A protein has these predicted regions:
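Residues that define the transmembrane beta-barrel architecture of outer-membrane proteins
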Residues: 39-41, 68-76, 120-130, 144, ...
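Transmembrane beta-strands of outer-membrane beta-barrel pores
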Residues: 47-57, 82, 99-109, 124-126, ...
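Outer-membrane beta-barrel translocator domains and adjoining extracellular loop/strand segments
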Residues: 54-64, 104-118, 158-175, 209, ...
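Repeated loop/turn-to-beta-strand initiation elements of outer-membrane beta-barrel proteins
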Residues: 83-93, 138-146, 202-206, 320-326, ...
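Outer-membrane beta-barrel "beta-signal"
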Residues: 189-207, 417-432
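Detector for outer-membrane/organellar transmembrane beta-barrel domains
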Residues: 195, 201, 209, 265-373
Length: 432
């Protein structure tokens, strides 16, 4: 199994390199000193469906409880996202709140010196969760920065559980086990990291809009990268005046844009540009390279409860054309824990394809290897995890969106992750 996994990874890496080398359609060369600004506050509300697998284990010297579940949930979602990417800092803030019905099925084991219970169970109830995150990269010159990042989340589940299985007591007597109970779970986690880094990922959203409009509506004229950049700055000036609380008028903004095209670039206004202006609202897409390192910690109110260590992360993004973006990242963490230390790495490569200014297709692959260092009989053993993924995002109009994600976790021994698919659909309204 391990030989097959390694062979698969090697083959995939070779294929990725071949494809990447052949991507000669990349048209732009952005200088390190060239900085694009991006400021946006987005408020979303709608419905979010999620289905996936989860597990939990608690051990003491005399007792062990283990549970695996495949769950689904449909929740009302409220989300607030804020980006403030300037020349001297890059900030991001996210807040998310969800609540709705929860259902699922799985199995659990409750083992002690008194009895061992193994049962299948079904659950139905309510799931609520909230999360908040903040990250700030402060640039004390054009290339070097310091990082502060903190994340936190909490989840409360309340549900009915129907269990059916067998119980084996200390005398090896086996009896049937059937139980209906009301259960609740409260889980929360906090993690933070500080870091130092070099490089910058430039937000390319406004450049993408400028690139697309000029190339598609004025194809008879050749535009230099400098021409597109000037138009990019004007698009940013218009969009950065928005207020998410009061909203904005796309017809007024579109008129400002077309006036710039006419007065500054001597182009004839096109009436259909207003429809294009209503879309083009994607999550930040980037170009550039960045490497950072530093300490981190993570606290979770179940085992493993407190982890600390250090990390090294490299990010690369390439704006190829208005339609294509390529993304690559490689990171490694040293995780220290009271019972066992381990090294965990992650390699990720993916592509994004943008259909006009309305839709986005994502696809890619993550490889997650891990090695236990001490405290285990499996010291030095390599464990592998694989996560292929696809995604689709579309803007139905200036305010309505659909976001679909599908991934599959693949693990040979399930020490790093629980194998199985993850699927989510969000249908929501947006104000920005």
């Amino acid at each position: 199994m391990k030989k097959n996994a390694v062979a698969f990874v090697v083959s995939l890496v070779v294929l990725i390199l071949i494809i990447s080398v052949q991507e000669s359609f990349a048209q732009y060369d952005f200088k390190n000193s060239e900085i694009f600004l991006f400021q946006k506050n987005e408020i979303d509300w709608g419905l979010h469906y999620y289905s996936g697998s989860e597990r939990e284990e608690t051990r003491t010297e005399t007792w062990r409880e283990y549970e695996e579940l495949t769950t689904g949930a449909v929740k009302f979602q409220f989300k607030n996202q804020f980006w403030n990417f300037l020349d001297y800092k890059q900030e991001r803030f996210d807040f998310n709140l969800e609540a709705g019905p929860l259902w699922g099925n799985g199995n659990w084991v409750d083992s002690s010196s008194v009895a061992n219970i193994e049962a299948d169970h079904n659950i139905f109830g309510l799931r609520t969760n909230a999360s908040v995150s903040y990250a700030s990269r402060y640039y004390y010159n054009n290339k070097n920065y310091t990082l502060v990042q903190i994340n936190g989340w909490a989840r409360y589940d309340f549900y009915n559980q129907n269990s059916n299985g067998i119980s084996t007591d200390s005398n090896e007597v086996v009896t049937g086990f059937e139980e209906t109970t009301k259960e609740d779970k409260f889980r929360y986690s906090v993690d933070a990291r500080a870091g130092w880094g070099m490089g910058r990922l430039k937000p390319m959203n406004h450049f993408m809009v400028a690139d697309y409009i000029l190339k598609n509506y004025y194809s008879e004229r050749n535009f230099s990268q400098a021409d597109i950049t000037k138009f990019t700055n004007e698009i940013g000036r218009i969009k950065h005046q928005r207020d998410a609380r009061s909203g904005h008028k796309t017809d007024v903004e579109s008129a400002q844009m077309q006036e710039y095209l006419n007065q500054k670039m001597f182009l004839i206004p096109v009436s259909s540009l207003e429809e294009e202006w209503k879309t083009g609202e994607f999550l930040p897409r980037f170009d550039g390279n960045r490497v950072e390192f530093g300490p981190f910690f993570k606290y979770y109110n179940r085992e493993p409860d407190f982890i600390y260590g250090g990390y090294l992360l490299f990010d690369h993004a390439k704006y190829c054309t208005a339609r294509w973006n390529r993304n690559f990242s490689a990171g490694i963490n040293y995780n220290a824990y009271k019972k066992q230390d381990w090294i965990l790495a992650e390699l990720s490569i993916g592509w994004s394809y943008f259909l006009k200014l309305r839709s986005q297709f994502d696809f890619g692959f993550k490889y997650v290897p891990g090695i236990a260092i001490n405290g285990s009989g499996n010291d030095g053993e390599l464990n592998n995890g694989f996560i292929p993924y696809v995604g689709y995002f579309t803007q139905i109009n200036s305010k309505s969106r659909v976001d679909i994600k599908l991934s599959c976790r693949i693990s040979e021994d399930e020490k790093l992750m629980l194998s199985g698919p993850e699927f989510s659909v969000s249908v929501y309204r947006s104000r920005y």
